[in-house]
């Protein structure tokens, strides 16, 4: 929910017309019906989808998608972690081969294993970014910096939400926005 809200806020700050929907509310179908009724279509959708919703999704065709982490919190619904992982990975399904960018949490090996060979990947994590297109953290003196490659973006203390988990959320949102062409400055 935090990352979806951050993506929506960042896109709006970049003057994009964006519709934020899904688990975050409103429901995707309600938001879609509103757009149909008003004939007002956004430039972008920022959607939060659950593994439950993805089970019946043939393909999302997202320009960019992410799985933030995998944990055992839904094993009451799934027979195994593998089944849960397969459901979550459906967010990356696309009709066109090679289409859609994957934003992957490099601190979660199970998420990294979702990398598709025909897709571009951008990673985020709580360490120094391994390449110029990846996002991460630099700890320097008493400061913690959010980074894109070797470029310092902002101090984590400047985030409205605090904690390393929220720094990771911000990095994921930054990676998603960058991947669709939003300037980060």
PLM regions and their residue ranges:
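Phosphate-binding loop of NTP-binding sites
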Residues: 2-106, 110-120, 138
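Adenine nucleotide phosphate-binding catalytic loops in nucleotide-utilizing enzymes
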Residues: 80-82, 120-185
């Amino acid at each position: 929910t935090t990352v979806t809200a951050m993506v929506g806020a960042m896109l709006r700050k970049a003057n994009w017309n964006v519709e934020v929907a899904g688990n975050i509310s409103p429901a995707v179908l309600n938001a879609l019906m509103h757009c149909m009724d008003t004939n007002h279509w956004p430039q972008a959708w920022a959607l939060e989808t659950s593994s439950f919703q993805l089970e019946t999704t043939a393909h999302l065709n997202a320009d960019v998608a992410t799985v933030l982490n995998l944990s055992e919190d839904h094993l009451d619904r799934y027979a195994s972690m593998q089944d849960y992982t397969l459901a979550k990975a459906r967010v990356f399904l696309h009709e066109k081969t090679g289409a859609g960018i994957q934003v992957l949490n490099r601190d979660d090996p199970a998420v990294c294993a979702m990398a598709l060979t025909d897709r571009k990947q951008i990673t985020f994590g709580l360490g120094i970014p391994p390449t110029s297109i990846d996002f991460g953290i630099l700890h320097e003196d008493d400061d913690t910096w959010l980074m894109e490659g070797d470029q310092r973006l902002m101090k984590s203390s400047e985030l409205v939400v605090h904690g390393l988990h929220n720094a990771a959320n911000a990095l994921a949102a930054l990676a998603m926005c960058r991947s669709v062409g939003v300037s980060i400055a």
